[in-house]
């Protein structure tokens, strides 16, 4: 049986940390069940790719989801999940001047369109 493939489109970070955490919690559960997935970060979500940024998200609701930085570490280190960054957002969020997290790559919107040809999308 062919693996199901997904792309998680994340558009929030500091503005809605619980939304980002919920997406990553779901993704962690899905990869544990052998589903293939990666993330495409857009708008405020691109900040998650900035090294050290996820650790600053300390105002999540208590006892709801694991902290964003812990979820990202698990997804990257244990499951090899990639975090693609929308190239149109790079200059606006000054990501061209900082170090990115492991498994982060800058890609154009057309790359997301290509991914959507054979993947289901979940947007947060």
For each of these PLM feature ranges, what is it?
Residues 82-87, 93-101, 105-106, 110-113:
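A short aromatic-anchored loop/beta-hairpin motif
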Residues 45-58:
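N-terminal beta-loop-helix "entrance" segment that forms/cooperates
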Residues 56-87:
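A glycine-rich helix N-cap at a beta->alpha junction
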Residues 8-21:
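Short, glycine-rich nucleotide/cofactor-binding loops
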Residues 37-43, 83-87:
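Short internal beta-strands
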Residues 20-33, 39:
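Histidine-anchored nucleotide/phosphate-binding helix
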Residues 2-7:
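Extreme N-terminal starter segment of soluble prokaryotic enzymes
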Residues 120-124:
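Short hydrophobic/aromatic patches at helix-to-coil boundaries
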